[in-house]
Amino acid sequence: MRYNTQESQPQTSICKVVGFFDFQQLWRKKEGLKPKQIIEQVRMLHGVHINYKQAWRVREEAQILVRGTPEDSYYNLSRWLYKITETNPGSLTYQHVDAAGKFKYAFVAFGPSIRGFSLMRRVIAVDGTFLKGKFNGTLLAACAQDGNYHLYPLAFAVVDAENGASWKWFFRGLSQKIPDASDLVFVSDRANSISSALEDVYPLSHHGICRIHLLRNITPTYAKTGLLPLVESAADAYTCHEFWLIFKDIKDKCPELAKYLEESDFRKWARSYAPANRYNIMTTNIAESLNSMLKMPRELPIISLLETIRLTMTTWFFERREAAAKHKHLVTPKVVQKLVSRLGAAMLLNVYQVDRSEFEVKDETMKFVVDLEKRHCTCNVFDIDKIPCIHAIAAAKHIKRDENRFVDASHLTETWAKAYAESIHPGGELSTSTYPENIDELSCPPPATKKKSGRPPTKRKRSVGEFGVPGSKSQSHKCSRCGTGGHNKITCQRPIG
């Protein structure tokens, strides 16, 4: 009997036998081996020559051994959700089916994370990203930022698509743990589905739009005006006076752009006009960075995807808890860096004390009023960032006070440690656990999907304004006729005059 030739056994048998060896690799490496690596490994270890298609099937077989089939993952989802709530008290999970009883939505918010949010600045960035597995779908995420400016995940949902109904369902779940309030801020892209859902579920909260998405929207029409840096500066301005100095310049140079920005509502994109404090969170980067981190897990069955998120959060909570315990400074490491970077400029200012807590601080051209007790400066940086500006630092140094004492409680090391004080626990092995009878009654089949023609996408389409690294495949290209992006000289319809 021959054991070392491809003809000695059927294709499927090769996949099952060799899949065991890749199975071992998958335990040590999240993404497993690439098909080309599998071809080489099988040739070297077993003397069997397989082609790329067979190697791909080997990889799929190995992933099934590790993670189960995508179909089984949906059937077992109710068990996984139950175990998470059992091992992590205060967690919230939901599962929703369609009219045919098939999976439609799933929601997860871990109790330790939700409780930790009560110690943080009340700004939540939300974003969605498509899933790349057999049944497609979309992952919705809500994230905050901790006192050390780290990403802090709050809630997730797997839904059929990113639309008004799914966002409303997601926000309804989130509102069970984070109620509506006037000091709560959501930051997102300009999708109408998010806006309408927030208006319905969180009417008291403020909805701000991401500065980067605003710039992407105006790039196709106004990039050649050279005013995009001014728009960015206007969005980031701390005072209305500073905002209007910049906006007047925009209006004088391009009235059409100024009109568009006015119609976009200053309160949504300009920090100085926001009715609730956005602090430093002017973009959805914290949510998008999470989606980027989950690039590979988005291909996995639903339980493996959610388990990857859980494991990531478990690791983050442990590592950051340890880091906070070792950090001996009053304020978090990133805030220490900010204050140190401002110290040099602060020492060049002239300070005049008005009373016990009020000071007049002057530079070469302007003067500012600082009230250390009220944690206020007329530059508004102290008020919004909740960290002493250069003027407040100068005032504190003038009376020999430690500027760290005037940092907001959300940035204290003690608060940072409390946010990660609890652990996020694994749910345990599903096959050996016991469950209440009603849990298996909630089991549902996977969603019905319509397979699209052609190869399924693994990358989202980039919007205008997302430029690649020079020399890379993702680099943007400009029309050789008119010099703008988005088309080539063959399809160019711009008048040249």
Where do the protein language model's features map onto the residues?
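Active-site beta-loop-alpha junctions of metal-dependent nucleic acid enzymes
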Residues: R2-V18, K30, K134-F135, F156-P179
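Short, basic interhelical loop/turn and adjoining N-cap
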Residues: R43-K53
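Short conserved beta-strand segments at catalytic cores or DNA/RNA-binding microdomains
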Residues: G116, K134, T138-H150
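Cysteine-centered loop/knuckle micro-motif
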Residues: A55, C389, K489-R494
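Two-metal-ion RNase H-like nuclease active-site motif
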Residues: V108-P112, M120-L131
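Hydrophobic, aromatic-enriched, well-ordered structural segments
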Residues: N51, I64-D72, N76-F117, S175, ...
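Short Cys/His-rich zinc-binding micro-motifs
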Residues: H376-D383, H477-H487
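Basic, short loop/linker segments at the boundary and entry of helix-turn-helix/winged-helix-like folds
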Residues: M1-G32, P456-T458, S463-V464, V469-K473
